[in-house]
């Protein structure tokens, strides 16, 4: 069945608290999607973020981001009582001020923990039994805060850094309240997420999640299971991820994420990946796998190299991993972010897995149309069509900044003149395409310019902060989307 959806992260929702959350605005947006005829809500990775606030550099592949917990919902559920005169952080219409939000939300979550933990203990204990990663993640987060937030390889106590048994016990006792607090936050996040997901699913809306292929160097994952990664005896990465030099970057890109020990994981029957994907399948109905090509072949760069030029391509786990995942998780629905260097091995793996790849309309008008896989005339059914993604400029921003030749190619093919009708033309392009799914960022639905861009790759600061203004998702907008969905048979 042909479907369509909106890409908008939870943090971008409007409302009190300074950041979007799993509160009433999330439910209202689900109502908007239902009215619009949209069957997909795509979000960015939901893990806890730190320096830079990138959802793609999370402290855990399993944990949820406590900043997305709705404190208003905690009050409504009787888990948080505010003092007279105490208020939520006021609504900020357009940008998330992360430091301010974190300070304020931490204060309210600590208060909810002290008021409510005791009454929730039976449920929390069951949560700990069901989600075995939580205990280590809570300890990791408590110790990290204890040492001022420095990355775990720089912790001054060698015992806890290397996870010696006596040190684990010592810190668990010493930081008991903080550990319990972080368990509480995870319990609340997943409780609110489950309620939210049930609401969306009951309206026929599938939650479309996002999963980075790699983990952050400074994460509970590398601290808890260092044997899974290419680390030396001091737990420093031996080699890191990235991509080679190309037309856009003479030095390539060095992402810095530690690489997997794929041979070791093969002998463990890929259990680490099975558990990771099992967690994703609980969170989401569909999972977009970022940098999917890394399963076919991945670029390996020596740790400490000045750039990515000295890296080399290495064969990835390929079909062996996905045979295991198919056996253990037969209902797992995956979309491959297959942007980047396409090789025969990548194409063969995509065919074996059978999952849709991606097409991005704003990538489609540079160079020769016949050789451009993103040119709309080259799209086919087993793809997800996007006007753009979180890493691109908005479509209005793209129209304003594209070079003359590229813009003329788009105007000639899509038949538009100005910015507003151009954005509309791109939206109609993806909705009318043969692709099985079509996804439009909310910024494009609202015809917003570059000021609403979510992320500018290669930059630090100012990213991930866009928020939709209250009242922007109007009935008129929903009605127009529904008319297009009906016209292009996506309802």
Give the location of each predicted region.
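Conserved, well-ordered alpha-helix/loop/beta-strand core segments that scaffold catalytic motifs
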Residues: 182-215
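Short acidic catalytic loops
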Residues: 38-45, 200, 206-212, 282-294
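Alpha-amylase-like alpha-glycosidases and glucanotransferases acting on alpha-linked glucans and related
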Residues: 9, 15, 53-186, 190, ...
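Trp/Phe/Arg-rich N-terminal binding region typifying the photolyase-homology
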Residues: 1-79
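Surface-exposed amphipathic alpha-helices with a cationic face
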Residues: 34, 193-201, 326, 350-351
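Aromatic/hydrophobic pocket-lining residues that form π-stacking "cages" and hydrophobic walls in ligand
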Residues: 29, 196, 346
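Terminal-tail/helix-coil boundary detector
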Residues: 466, 471-491
């Amino acid at each position: 069945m042909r479907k369509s959806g909106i890409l908008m992260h939870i943090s971008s929702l409007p409302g009190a608290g300074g950041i979007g959350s799993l509160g009433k605005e999330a439910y209202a947006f689900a109502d908007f999607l239902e009215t619009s005829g949209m069957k997909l809500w795509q979000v960015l990775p939901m893990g806890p973020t730190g320096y830079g606030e990138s959802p793609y550099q999370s402290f855990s592949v399993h944990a949820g981001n406590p900043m997305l917990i709705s404190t208003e919902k905690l009050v409504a559920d009787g888990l948080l009582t505010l003092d007279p005169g105490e208020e939520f952080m006021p609504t900020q219409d357009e940008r998330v001020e992360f430091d301010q939000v974190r300070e304020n939300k931490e204060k309210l979550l600590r208060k909810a923990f002290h008021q409510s933990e005791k009454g929730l203990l039976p449920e929390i204990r069951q949560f700990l039994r069901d989600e075995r990663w939580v205990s280590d993640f809570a300890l990791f987060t408590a110790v990290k805060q204890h040492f001022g937030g420095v990355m775990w390889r720089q912790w001054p106590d060698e015992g806890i850094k290397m996870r010696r048994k006596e040190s684990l016990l010592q810190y668990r006792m010493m930081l008991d309240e903080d550990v319990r607090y972080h368990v509480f936050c995870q319990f609340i996040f997943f409780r609110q997420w489950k309620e939210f997901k049930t609401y969306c699913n009951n309206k026929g809306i599938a939650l479309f999640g996002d999963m980075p292929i790699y983990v952050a160097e400074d994460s509970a994952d590398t601290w808890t299971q260092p044997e899974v990664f290419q680390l030396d005896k001091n737990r420093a990465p031996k080699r890191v991820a990235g991509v080679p030099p190309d037309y856009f970057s003479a030095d390539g890109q060095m992402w810095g994420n530690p690489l997997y020990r794929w041979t070791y994981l093969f002998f463990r029957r890929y259990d680490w990946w099975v558990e990771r994907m099992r967690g994703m399948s609980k969170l989401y109905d569909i999972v977009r796998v970022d940098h999917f090509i890394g399963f076919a072949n991945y670029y390996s760069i020596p740790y400490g190299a000045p750039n990515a030029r000295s890296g080399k391509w290495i064969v990835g786990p390929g079909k062996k991993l996905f045979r295991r995942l198919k056996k253990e998780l037969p209902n797992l629905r995956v979309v491959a972010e297959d942007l980047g260097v396409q090789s025969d091995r990548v194409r063969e793996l995509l065919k074996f897995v059978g999952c849709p790849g991606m097409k991005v309309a704003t990538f489609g008008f540079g160079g020769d149309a016949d050789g451009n896989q993103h040119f709309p005339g080259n799209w086919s059914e087993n793809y997800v069509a996007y006007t753009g993604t979180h890493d691109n400029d908005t479509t209005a921003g793209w129209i304003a900044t594209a070079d003359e030749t590229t813009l003329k190619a788009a105007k000639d093919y899509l038949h538009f003149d100005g910015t507003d009708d151009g954005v509309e033309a791109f939206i109609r392009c993806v909705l009318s395409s043969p692709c099985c799914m079509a996804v439009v960022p909310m910024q494009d639905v609202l015809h917003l310019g570059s000021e609403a861009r979510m992320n500018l790759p290669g930059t630090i600061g100012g990213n991930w902060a866009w928020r939709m203004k209250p009242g922007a998702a109007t009935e008129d907008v929903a009605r127009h989307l529904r008319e297009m969905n009906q016209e292009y048979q996506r309802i």
